[in-house]
């Protein structure tokens, strides 16, 4: 039967190996089975293939602590949490909060520990940032100022359109490789509910306007305002405003934070549709599935409910 070795026994193994003793002789000397010695050496060898007793002992302690941590969480609960990670790509915080609403207790720290201890790296692939957070300096885009006729500044937007009431939207366009493909994205600010569709004619303002009208027409009564940036693709904003009976406001130049809801949503989309990808390589069904997955994610701001649930609660 396998026994946990002490530091003294590990030191004795080291001395035995140096003395060219057989595994059987070492096992007899420290009163353990030969299989225990064999497993110990295979499990704790260093990069050169040798056995370092001190490193072996530290690694064993770390493994033991990890097992103890995971042992506190019943296996079915851990499996349920990891299923949400792998199938839904939710963050540990989202998983923990969602399960808590179901009466199931598991901390996000426990989930993070399991991810870090997964030597295959498979679990890490389902974490949005791969547990690495890099801060890049923002570069100002070298674009010519665009004059959008009759644009209304965000500073004229009513105070109540602060993201807390239902019906205030943000609009954007994400571009594919070489700016030859695009996807229109719309986000309802209070619920983070996302609507996204491929734009067949990239940066064509009239086609974009008609597409946005089609996307939001089913929710026309729930479109109080739309906020967007100063891209030339939004030049036909008056056509959108007229057909949806709404008001459209434009952010200041280089002020992406003024439409933070759609900016953050676009980052979630990039988990599935990365930068540099030609959108013509993906299907409309894949785009719909991406929208579906993002709308199903529980959010902290929604008390770990999903945007889909809270959005359609307003219609019940």
What residues fall within each predicted segment?
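Acidic/histidine-rich, metal-coordinating catalytic segments
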Residues: 221-236, 254
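Two-metal-ion RNase H-like nuclease active-site motif
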Residues: 166-176
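Mobile genetic element proteins and their domesticated derivatives, centered on retroelements
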Residues: 13, 37, 81, 95, ...
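Basic, flexible linker segments flanking DNA-binding modules
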Residues: 55-59, 106-161
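Active-site beta-loop-alpha junctions of metal-dependent nucleic acid enzymes
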Residues: 175-179, 196-220
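Charged alpha-helix within mobile-element recombinases
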Residues: 19, 29-31, 78, 87-88, ...
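Short loop/turn microsegments at loop-to-beta-strand junctions
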Residues: 181-183
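Short, basic alpha-helical/linker "hinge" immediately adjacent to a nucleic-acid-recognition surface
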Residues: 1-89, 93, 97-98
């Amino acid at each position: 039967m396998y026994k946990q070795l002490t530091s003294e026994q590990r030191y004795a193994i080291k001395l035995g190996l140096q003395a060219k003793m057989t595994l059987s002789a070492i096992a007899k000397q420290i009163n353990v089975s030969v299989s225990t010695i064999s497993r110990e050496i295979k499990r704790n060898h260093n990069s050169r293939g040798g056995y370092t007793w001190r490193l072996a002992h530290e690694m064993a302690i770390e493994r033991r602590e990890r097992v103890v941590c995971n042992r506190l969480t019943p296996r079915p609960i851990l499996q349920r949490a990891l299923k949400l990670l792998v199938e839904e790509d939710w963050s540990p915080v989202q998983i923990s909060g969602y399960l808590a609403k179901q009466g199931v207790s598991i901390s996000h720290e426990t989930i993070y520990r399991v991810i870090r201890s997964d030597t295959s790296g498979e679990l890490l692939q389902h974490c949005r940032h791969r547990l690495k957070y890099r801060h890049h300096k923002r570069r100002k885009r070298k674009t010519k100022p665009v004059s959008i006729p009759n644009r209304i500044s965000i500073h004229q937007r009513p105070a109540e359109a602060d993201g807390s009431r239902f019906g205030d939207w943000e609009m954007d366009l994400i571009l594919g490789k070489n700016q030859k493909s695009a996807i229109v994205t719309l986000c309802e600010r209070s619920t983070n509910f996302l609507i996204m569709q491929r734009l067949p004619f990239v940066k064509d303002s009239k086609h974009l306007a008609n597409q946005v009208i089609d996307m939001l027409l089913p929710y026309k009564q729930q479109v109080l305002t739309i906020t967007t940036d100063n891209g030339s693709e939004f030049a036909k904003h008056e056509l959108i405003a007229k057909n949806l009976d709404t008001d459209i406001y434009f952010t200041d130049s280089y002020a992406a934070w003024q439409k933070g809801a759609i900016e953050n949503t676009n980052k979630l989309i990039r988990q599935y549709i990365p930068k540099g990808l030609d959108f013509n390589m993906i299907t409309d069904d894949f785009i719909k599935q991406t929208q579906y997955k993002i709308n199903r994610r529980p959010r902290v701001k929604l008390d770990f409910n999903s945007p889909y649930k809270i959005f359609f609660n307003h219609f019940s």
